[in-house]
From Swiss-Prot:
UniProt protein name: Large ribosomal subunit protein uL11
Gene Ontology terms: biological process: translation
GO molecular function per UniProt: large ribosomal subunit rRNA binding; structural constituent of ribosome
GN (gene name): rplK
Source taxonomy: Bacteria, Pseudomonadati, Thermodesulfobacteriota, Desulfobacteria, Desulfobacterales
Presence of the UniProt keyword RNA-binding in the record: yes
Organism: Desulforapulum autotrophicum (strain ATCC 43914 / DSM 3382 / VKM B-1955 / HRM2) (Desulfobacterium autotrophicum)
Function: Forms part of the ribosomal stalk which helps the ribosome interact with GTP-bound translation factors.
Length: 140
């Protein structure tokens, strides 16, 4: 018989740096999950992605056990890294803060393909290009 799901928790945690402090501790603690078990498992799984923010979906079961799925880093973070900027524009239509090439967009789209709702790479590239435009990054 399958375990009964008690909660789904979505967090964004820096790779390899999960610790019991907020936001992880309170989010897991209120469901009775062993926080250190999660932190050790997450840090072990994301050790080679150091410096990236990794979205994670934690499924908590009735017996207080858990499983988690790590996703690819957010497109905005990948675009900021590609354009070598620290943050996007406050007024993206007026102020352009950086530039990315089409090849960089294809690279990001293929990396994000499993998490995007796109049928092929061209559709994924247009999604990433839209994100870039909304951040004030020019696509060349």
């Amino acid at each position: 018989m399958a375990k009964k799901v008690m909660a789904l928790i979505k967090l964004q945690v820096e790779a390899g740096k999960a610790n019991p402090s907020p936001p992880i501790g309170p989010a897991l603690g209120q469901h009775g999950v062993n926080i250190m078990d999660f932190c050790k498992a997450f840090n072990a799984r994301t050790a080679n992605d150091a410096g990236s923010i990794i979205p994670v979906v934690i499924t908590v079961y009735q017996d207080r056990s858990f499983t988690f799925i790590t996703k690819t880093p957010p497109a905005s973070m990948l675009l900021k890294r590609a354009a070598k900027i620290s943050k996007g524009s406050g007024v993206p239509n007026r102020d352009k803060v950086g530039k990315v090439t089409h090849d960089q967009l294809v690279e990001i789209a293929t990396l994000k393909m499993e998490d995007l709702n796109a049928a092929d790479v061209d559709a994924a590239v247009s999604i990433i290009a839209g994100t870039a435009r909304s951040m004030g990054i020019e696509v060349v």
